[in-house]
């Protein structure tokens, strides 16, 4: 596990550890390793689109967790990452994807589309059309049954408009 032992911060810095957040340190200097401070979690939204090759833009890592954490932009190793809280019953729909030497949980295409609507994130229409073209009907319909009614109805309208 890439987290360091706890101890005084001066001693940790001397050993090469970097602080992620209160109580969490790592030896790695890549911002994607900030995730270990927020278990359980998955990468979602724009970051999931980037990691799955659906969006070419470089994005800040977006960590989605059901834990009670402060939402917003944080910094690690002078790079930004975003932490978002999601309801426990909405915490599903991710798979492990290899990233460098680790496997990281990344939301699948169906859940990424749902999360984009849930969090009110706007992405270009061509990205949405590409996502809808790659949706697995069975998986998407099973996810719709897990959602609150208002969100499920909204997702059906969006998918119908894009002619799926």
List the model feature ranges, each with a label.
Residues 1-4, 55, 150:
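Short coil/loop linkers at secondary-structure junctions
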Residues 52-110:
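Exposed, interaction-prone assembly regions rather than primary DNA-binding/catalytic cores
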Residues 94-164:
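Hydrophobic alpha-helical interaction segments
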């Amino acid at each position: 596990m890439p987290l360091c032992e706890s101890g005084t911060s001066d001693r940790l810095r001397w050993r090469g550890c970097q602080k992620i957040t209160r109580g969490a340190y790592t030896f790695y200097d890549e911002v994607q390793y900030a995730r270990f401070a927020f278990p359980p979690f998955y990468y979602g939204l724009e970051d999931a689109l980037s990691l799955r090759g659906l969006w070419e833009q470089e994005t800040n890592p977006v960590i989605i967790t059901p834990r009670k954490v402060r939402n917003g932009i944080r910094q690690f190793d002078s790079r930004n990452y975003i932490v978002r809280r999601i309801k426990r019953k909405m915490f599903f729909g991710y798979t492990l994807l290899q990233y460098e030497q680790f496997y990281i949980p990344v939301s699948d295409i169906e859940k990424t589309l749902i999360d984009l609507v849930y969090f009110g994130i706007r992405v270009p229409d061509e990205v949405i059309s590409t996502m809808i073209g790659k949706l697995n009907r069975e998986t998407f319909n099973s996810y719709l049954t897990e959602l609150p009614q208002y969100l499920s109805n909204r997702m059906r309208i969006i998918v119908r408009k894009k002619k799926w």
